[in-house]
């Protein structure tokens, strides 16, 4: 009788651990889909923004080209890792584009450009929140896969650690800020 209770308890624990891993894997997949929705929105906004600003920004072709090429890589990426890398390039390119746009007063006055810029900023914020939620769920899944004794269930049923969504190295760099009160002399 005691043996039967122990066997039932072990089987129940295995079922619980397996179901928890499946649930976490599904949460990771769902979190990625949430990021995907926002990335699709960003991909839809980029051509409109490029079209709106390219007439003004004759000397910034490299920046515009970088954004367009990164978008093309992201859309055609064969796997999630390649897509994450391409999306990081888009984020970097859009950051440069927004910074360069500050040098063009005509763009600041163009209502269509301002609306697109606002939509893109909102989308970037939503992507950041979705990435954070995704990475939180990945942390939970990866922790479960690595801790004993759940790691035994994970390895026997083929559960793999998920990859974090990492930002581009440029996003992680500490910005240089000059707070000196002196003005540069020519």
Model regions and ranges:
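A helix-centric hydrophobic-segment signal that preferentially recognizes long
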Residues: 1-186
């Amino acid at each position: 009788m005691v043996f039967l209770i122990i066997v039932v308890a072990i089987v129940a624990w295995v079922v619980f651990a397996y179901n928890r891993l499946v649930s976490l894997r599904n949460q990771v997949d769902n979190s990625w889909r949430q990021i995907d929705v926002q990335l699709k929105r960003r991909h839809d906004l980029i051509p409109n923004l490029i079209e709106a600003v390219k007439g003004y920004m004759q000397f910034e072709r490299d920046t515009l080209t970088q954004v367009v090429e990164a978008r093309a890589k992201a859309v055609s990426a064969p796997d999630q890792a390649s897509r994450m890398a391409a999306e990081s390039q888009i984020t970097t390119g859009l950051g440069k584009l927004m910074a360069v746009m500050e040098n063009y007063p005509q763009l600041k006055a163009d209502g269509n450009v301002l609306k697109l810029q606002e939509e893109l900023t909102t989308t970037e914020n939503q992507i950041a929140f979705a990435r954070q939620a995704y990475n939180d769920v990945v942390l939970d899944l990866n922790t479960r896969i690595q801790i004993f004794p759940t790691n035994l269930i994970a390895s026997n049923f083929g559960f793999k650690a998920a990859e974090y969504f990492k930002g581009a190295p440029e996003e992680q760099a500490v910005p240089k800020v000059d707070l000196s009160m002196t003005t540069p002399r020519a």
